[in-house]
Regions:
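C-terminal hydrophobic helical "lid"/dimerization subdomain
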Residues: 1, 241, 269-273, 277, ...
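Glycine-rich beta-strand-centered segment in the early N-terminal region that forms part
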Residues: 23-37, 50-97, 102, 154-158
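Mid-domain Rossmann-like dinucleotide-binding core that forms the NAD(H)/NADP(H) cofactor-binding site
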Residues: 79, 143-144, 150-152, 156-241, ...
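N-terminal Rossmann-like NAD(P) cofactor-binding module of classical short-chain dehydrogenase/reductase
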Residues: 84, 256-259
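Cysteine-cluster motifs in flexible loop/terminal segments that predominantly coordinate metals
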Residues: 87-150
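Glycine-rich phosphate-binding loop and adjacent beta-alpha segment
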Residues: 264-332, 366
């Protein structure tokens, strides 16, 4: 069958709209008609080949849609179900069976291999050549796509499907890092470096956790203003003032918890300095391979500081995404305030607006 896709064809270049052939749905796959998909920073860095996957490639890993068909081995969803698409995992390795599928031993191959394990791709161009697929198990920048079952999360039909896609990655990453990993106590302090969609999701989670001091750090005043609206008690423009000194002034002895969503080496070092005794920091921002960060090992040791490296919020999507949706329905997790919708034909504008900071979470609607 045919599918319309936004295809990455050259390093750093805008995506191209192409009609592709979608192959048959395999036994462990679900064919999904996309309703919408988020645009994430990870899509941009793979488009730019910072993390190289063979081109041409259909990106997209925050899809939301309706199940059109299922493979013979699929048991978790049925035709007609509403679904959010998240990251893939094998389901049988030690990480998966212990409840940490984001650390699946096959994560790299399943999420960023560009093909199935047998080397086939789900998409073919008009000349019959292969187009890399299964990005994060889904490749959701297409009107219809084949998705690994373990990337599929069934959700209620009572919520607006158009905005649910970002729960599959960016929103899950920020909220999960706070709720699943940092687990701040009520009354504690937390500082969040970066006020993009991931950082704002962490901020919303900190509000849910009843943190009483929530500090947002960024270099864009408009994002800091939005952070204030969403629950930040303090904001710091680190371009204009010493963030670490200000954080220590606000908290007294350093923050109890910190989240770095930037992937910037210097910001990561700042995060370690901003934590107080027995503080716990988490890094979720993706950095280019080989990135190194200077930090004071002695300070970490003497202060008992703990640093966690967190992928996908250390979440089990099939349970965590419904939890976030339940919080959203109760008015406790208003992630919809981060979203701006774009038509499919505007996907490159969505990328540009995200990279400029004009839009927190672009969602492309089909």
């Amino acid at each position: 069958m045919k599918t319309l896709a936004a295809v990455a064809t050259s390093k750093g270049e805008p995506l191209e709209m192409r009609e592709l052939t979608l192959d048959e749905t395999r036994s462990d796959e679900v064919r999904v008609k996309l309703v919408a998909t988020g645009v994430c920073h990870t899509d941009a860095i793979v488009r730019d080949q910072i993390y190289p996957i063979p081109l041409p490639l259909v990106l997209g890993h925050e899809g939301a849609g309706i199940v059109e068909a299922i493979g013979d081995a699929v048991t978790s969803v049925e035709v007609g179900d509403h679904v959010v698409l998240s990251f893939p995992s094998c389901g049988v390795c030690g990480s998966c069976v212990s409840g940490h599928p984001a650390y699946c031993v096959d994560f790299g191959a399943l999420a960023m291999g560009g093909a199935r394990s047998d080397g086939t791709t789900a998409f073919q161009d008009e000349d019959g050549s292969n187009v890399s697929s299964h990005f994060f198990g889904q490749s959701s920048f297409a009107t219809v796509t084949n998705v690994y079952e373990r990337s599929v999360v069934k959700i209620s039909k009572d919520v607006p499907l158009e905005i649910m896609g970002p729960l599959g990655c960016g929103i899950q990453t920020g909220a999960g890092a706070v709720l699943n990993v940092l687990k701040p106590e009520a009354g504690s302090s937390i500082v969040i470096f970066g006020s993009g969609a991931v950082g704002m999701s962490g901020l919303l989670a900190a509000v849910i956790a009843n943190c009483t001091t929530i500090i947002a750090v960024d270099i864009v005043d408009s994002r800091l203003a939005r952070a204030k609206e969403l629950g930040a008690t303090h904001t710091i423009n680190s371009k204009n003032e010493d963030a670490v000194a200000k954080i220590r002034q606000i908290t007294g002895q350093g923050a109890n918890y910190a989240l770095d969503t930037t992937g910037n080496a210097m910001v990561f070092a700042q995060m370690t300095k901003a934590l107080g005794t027995l503080g716990h920091g988490a890094l979720v921002g993706a950095a280019a391979p080989g990135t190194e960060s200077p930090f004071d090992i002695g300070n970490l040791l003497l202060s008992g500081i703990k640093i966690s490296m967190v992928i996908e919020g250390d979440a089990v999507p099939q349970t965590f995404i419904p939890k976030l949706i339940s919080l959203y329905q109760k008015g406790l997790f208003p992630f919809d305030k981060l979203v701006k919708k774009y038509e499919f034909a505007e996907i490159n504008t969505a990328f540009a607006d995200s990279e400029s900071g004009d839009t927190l979470k672009p969602v492309v609607v089909f």
